[in-house]
Amino acid sequence: CIWNGFTMNGREDDYTWSDPYIDNKQVVVVRSDSGIDDFSGLKGKHVEVQTDSSALAALEGDQKDLAATFADLNQVAEYNTAFMDLESGACDAIAMDIGVANYQVNSRKNPDDYKILDKEISSEQYAVGFKKGNTELKDKVQKTLDEMAEDGTVDKIAEKYADYGVPGALCIGKNSK
């Protein structure tokens, strides 16, 4: 199975899926002193995004009109580079997953130097993907996940990552059949 922030949306027919466990969204991070408070503030700005990310897919797809307002949309190999660019002023904003954004902002020396814009670029759900037709393994994993959600184990684990927004993003147990 594949299980590491694996987006199910758009791939529903490619795999056998568990129920979703995270409601994820793509957001924009800016410096707090940038004067950028919403998407309109991104007009004419230099925005970075990770190559092959959901944020890039959204900005090249459903949100291409938003991306067209940017001075440019630069792809980077990983978000550490993007944050160094944001810190140095080489870019004005970063489009990224909310969990990674929360992690990156909260791990900075001065987290208050950054803010995540309120509006999301797009949203998606994470689930565990299995080889198409492998319902036996999917059912075993799903049963365990459901038990963990029911007995509070999932919430206890998620609470360890509260600084990254994990508890609020959980949907496991809410969509169970």
Please report, for each region that a protein language model flagged, where it lies by residue:
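Extended ligand-binding regions for polar small-molecule ligands
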Residues: G41-H46, T51-S54, A127-G165
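Ligand-binding clefts/hinges and TM-proximal coupling segments of bilobed small-molecule sensing domains
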Residues: S54-N74, D112-I116, L145-K177
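Periplasmic-binding protein-like
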Residues: I22-V30, I98, N106-D146, Y164-K177
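A ligand-binding cleft/hinge motif common to bilobed small-molecule-binding domains
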Residues: W3-D14, A58-G61, D85-S88, D92-S122
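Immediate post-signal peptide segment of exported/extracytoplasmic ligand-binding proteins
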Residues: G35-H46, I172-K177
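Acidic, polar ligand-binding/catalytic clefts
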Residues: C1-G41, E120
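Extracytoplasmic/secreted envelope proteins and their assembly/folding machinery
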Residues: W3, K25, F39, L56-E60, ...
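Short helix-initiation/N-cap motifs at beta->coil->alpha
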Residues: S34, D72-S88, E124
